C-alpha cells in the first residue's frame, strides 16, 4: 500500500504530522472450487458451524443458477452477491436484469470506497453478460439489512416500484429504453391470513440457521403463536407474500419487519 505523510498548520503555529495510509483492496470470487476454504464474510467460522454450513450449501446450489459472490480477501464484511433476476429469490419481474441480493461493507472497511468498487465490478460483469441493468431492494430511508438509498441514488439507481410496506425496488438500466423491473402482485400488498407471529425466511442469510430456532424456542416458552416458514426453492420465494424473503416477520396478518430477531430482540418485541 502507498503511504503519504502531510503536515497540518494550525493558527498557533503548532504543527502536527499525520500519516495517511491509502488502502487498496483485493477481491476474490467464491466458486464451487474454493468455497470450502474461503470464508463467507458475514459468518466467519469453521465449516461445521450451522450458520456457515447452511449458507455455503445454499451458495453451491445458486452457483448453478448464475450467482456471483465477490468478496474481500481480508476477513470481515466486504462483499457483493448477485444473480440473474430470473433466478432471484424474490417476487419480482425483471427479465434480463441482474439482481443484487446483498451488498455489505461494514466495520473498518467502510469509508474507503469498497462498496463502489464492488458495485462497479458487478456492473462490468453484468454488461459483459448482456444484461439490461441492475436491480436491488431498498427503501425511502435506510433500513437494517437493506442497501443505503443515498448510496444507490449517488450511483445512479432510481425507484421503479414500491410495496405497501415501504420496501422499494430500485434499478439502474444500461440502456434508456430498458423495461422497468417490478414487484409481482403477491408482493405489492404484504399481508397474510394467519394469526400470531409468522416468519418467512430463506437460507440466503446464514444467521437464520442459528437464530430462527432460538426465536421459536422463546415463543414456545412464552406461550406465543409462532410459525416459521422456510422458503426452500426460488419458486416458493418468487411467490411469497412479501417483497423481502430473506427475513419477513408478520403478526396477525400484518407485515412487521425485515430486521432479524434474536432472543433479546424478540422478547423486547413481545413486551410492546
Positions of the model-derived regions?
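Non-catalytic, surface beta->alpha helical segment in thiol-disulfide oxidoreductase systems
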Residues: 252-272
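Short amphipathic alpha-helix that is part of the acyltransferase structural core
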Residues: 15-75, 185-186, 206-207, 214-218
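Conserved acetyl-CoA binding element of GNAT-fold acetyltransferases
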Residues: 91-107
